[in-house]
């Protein structure tokens, strides 16, 4: 092989190894939904793709039938925040798996983890019920049942309102039983269930009726109530003591005023008996 060709080949191989090493050094982007990934039909969701500062271009991709399709791209300058993508008018075509990818120079780097978005409202709603009262103590158990009398769903999912990830409670039974427990205070919240089919796992039914679970720590509440009672009694005692002190002060002030009046004004008989004073038609009272 010609020396020039050998040198050129070495440069190409070294450059390729350097690029691969650089790609391995950069972290993969992070994808997240700013709200719940369970989105009603025609609703919207905001997706954020976090990448390193050196990334000048971020792409959002949807995976359909093992094929990547670009949903959008954002240019980012050095000091700008991570780009956000808004998915409007959610429907069956936009539900599915999403990933982010960023670029540095002319090179593409690896994809982020997968974010799954679900659209609801495509089938009739199921019914959610409980096997006991909805107020529980920590450590107790409860079972929620999701069923549909007219639609033969393959699977059901139980979702808690406010969660920013897909429901972890899934069942292939019909009706589906979801056991919660032993519960703690974090289990409190509003729950709904959904039905869906295995062939289209990102297309869900309307949400069921809502059930609100309340986990209460009665021991802590009793302790708090007792403290409130003690504080109220102490407050009443303090008010009573203040009232007694104020009354005593008023009584003492009135007595001092009467004593001062007796000293300052001599009696009528004492005035008549002073030497050199005579009063007409005055009975003799001086002795």
From Swiss-Prot:
Q: Which residues form the Ig-like C2-type domain?
A: 42-107, 139-200
Q: Which SUPFAM superfamilies match?
A: Immunoglobulin (SSF48726)
Tissue expression notes: Isoform A.1, isoform A.2 and isoform A.3 are differentially expressed between blood and mucosal myeloid cells. Isoform A.1, isoform A.2 and isoform A.3 are expressed in monocytes. Isoform A.1 and isoform A.2 are expressed in alveolar macrophages; however only one isoform is expressed at alveolar macrophages surfaces.
Q: Where is the signal peptide?
A: 1-21
GO cellular component term of the entry, any: extracellular region
Q: Where are the transmembrane segments?
A: 228-246
Q: What is the protein's name according to its record?
A: Immunoglobulin alpha Fc receptor
């Amino acid at each position: 092989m010609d020396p020039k060709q050998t040198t050129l080949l070495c440069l190409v191989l070294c450059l390729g190894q350097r690029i691969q090493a650089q790609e391995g050094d950069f972290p993969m982007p992070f994808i997240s939904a700013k709200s719940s990934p369970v989105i009603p039909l025609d609703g919207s969701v905001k997706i954020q793709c976090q990448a390193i500062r050196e990334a000048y271009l971020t792409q959002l991709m949807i995976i359909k039938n093992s094929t990547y399709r670009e949903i959008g791209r954002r240019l980012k300058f050095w000091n700008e925040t991570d780009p956000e993508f808004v998915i409007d008018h959610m429907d069956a075509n936009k539900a599915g798996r999403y990933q982010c990818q960023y670029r540095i120079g002319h090179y593409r780097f690896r994809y982020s983890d997968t974010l799954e978005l679900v659209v609801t409202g495509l089938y009739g709603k199921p019914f959610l019920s409980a096997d006991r009262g909805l107020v529980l103590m920590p450590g107790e158990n409860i079972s929620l049942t999701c069923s549909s009398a007219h639609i033969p769903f393959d699977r059901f999912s139980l979702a808690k309102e406010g969660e920013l990830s897909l429901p972890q409670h899934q069942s292939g039974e019909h009706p589906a039983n979801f056991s919660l427990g032993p519960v703690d205070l974090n289990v409190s919240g509003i729950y709904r269930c959904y039905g869906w089919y295995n062939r289209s796992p990102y297309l869900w039914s309307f949400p069921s009726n809502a059930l609100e679970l309340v986990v209460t720590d009665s021991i802590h509440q009793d302790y708090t109530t007792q403290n409130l009672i003690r504080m109220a009694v102490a407050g009443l005692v303090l008010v009573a003591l203040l009232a007694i002190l104020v009354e005593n002060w008023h009584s003492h002030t009135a007595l001092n005023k009467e004593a001062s009046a007796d000293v300052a004004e001599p009696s009528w008989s004492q005035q008549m008996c002073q030497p050199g004073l005579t009063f007409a038609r005055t009975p003799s009272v001086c002795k």
